[in-house]
Amino acid sequence: MLDIQQLRSNLDAVAEGLAKRGKPIDFSEFSALEAERKTLQTRTQDLQAQRNSLSKQIGMLKGKGEDASEVMAQVGSIGDELKASEARLAELLTQFNAILAALPNIPDDSVPVGSDETGNVEIKRWGTPRVFDFEVKDHTDVGEALGQLDFGTAAKISGARFSLLKGGLARLHRALAQFMLDTHTAEHGYTELYAPYLVNAASLYGTGQLPKFEEDLFKVLRGDQDPLYLIPTAEVPVTNIVRDEILSAEALPLKFVCHTPCFRSEAGSGGRDVRGMIRQHQFDKVELVQVVHPEKSAEAHEELTRQAEIILEKLELPYRRMALCSGDMGFSAAKTYDLEVWLPAQNTYREISSCSNFGAFQARRMQARFRNDKNKTELCHTLNGSGLAVGRTLVAILENNQNADGSVTIPAVLRPYMGGLEVLSAA
């Protein structure tokens, strides 16, 4: 959430910043409400001053034994008007909050300006895509030929955009998650968490999924109780650990890693990636979350992104880092790097991790604060990124490590998790 004081003091700068996202926002409603608020605030303060003055007169009159009924009637009338003014101010606050809740974050000054993914800027590449001496198959064909990837049975059980992994492939999927967790905890200093897969609306509001993106979520109704939602990412439960908390400055940074399934309706996918495991309703992710001092968030963003890259390098998967342009960033992000892994069957790079710095945007929605060196509370900065998406990493291994005989070579770093197995072959 943006700071309402920023809108009040420099609305033009806010509008200019948000316009970089490619969708100019009409602030006429905000301006009209703000004008009414100022008038009402001034009138309320005048009425309060009048009431206080008249109340003193009443005391003086009564002290002299004189009639105070006329002045008391004036106080009563002022009280009625005050009550109406205060009620309207409360309504305006609700309207302001609704406007603020719908506004995305302002892109950082370092973010390239562009309207869509064509404006994204490549920062680096790592690894050289393999040259095959046989016809490359996509991950769906590779997995099905192994007899270990079954979309038909998954569709029977649940419908489209689900998969069923079997045998060695299921074990490889588990090995990937374990390897990622071990790396981030042992080498990168993260604390592992096991978090709820169902969260309340307040948690989704805090990280920015609600109210704008409810159609992307799976909602669980519970009779007359408040609904819960299946998490779209571990970012939601993990970041909300600091909701409504005041931390000590010494406690920062907080660095958490969490492996969860993620659930998304893919309402806005427009029929993309229907085949295979690229875009599913249920998929696993190992998520990195940091809560940091505001002065450290830019540095933390580079660190977190690099930690996700290290996983790809250990797996020997070619990738590139992209700086997302202003029009392609997520709602809550101030700056985002995407890591894209090479998929030979598609002959292109595809997103496997998105690493974002949210600045104070989420913290303001969550009221996640720390006490600074002047003993005053200040908003934290939050960051997160996939370290990595497990299913898409599995896809990349199936495609990049496939062999002419249909087998798949297991990356060396995963073999200890696979009982020393070097190759996945058809049963």
UniProtKB/Swiss-Prot annotation:
Pfam families xref list: Seryl_tRNA_N, tRNA-synt_2b
An annotated Gene Ontology molecular function: ATP binding
InterPro entries reported for this sequence: aa-tRNA-synt_IIb, aa-tRNA-synth_II, aa-tRNA-synth_II/BPL/LPL, Ser-tRNA-ligase_type_1, Ser-tRNA-synth_1_N, SerRS_1_N_sf, SerRS_core, tRNA-bd_arm
GO terms for biological process, alphabetical: selenocysteine biosynthetic process; seryl-tRNA aminoacylation
Major subcellular site: cytoplasm
Residue numbers binding L-serine: 233-235, 287, 386
One of the record's GO cellular component terms: cytoplasm
Subcellular location: Cytoplasm
Assembly with partners or alone: Homodimer. The tRNA molecule binds across the dimer.
Function summary: Catalyzes the attachment of serine to tRNA(Ser). Is also able to aminoacylate tRNA(Sec) with serine, to form the misacylated tRNA L-seryl-tRNA(Sec), which will be further converted into selenocysteinyl-tRNA(Sec).
Family affiliation: Belongs to the class-II aminoacyl-tRNA synthetase family. Type-1 seryl-tRNA synthetase subfamily.
Protein name per its UniProtKB record: Serine--tRNA ligase
Name of the coding gene: serS
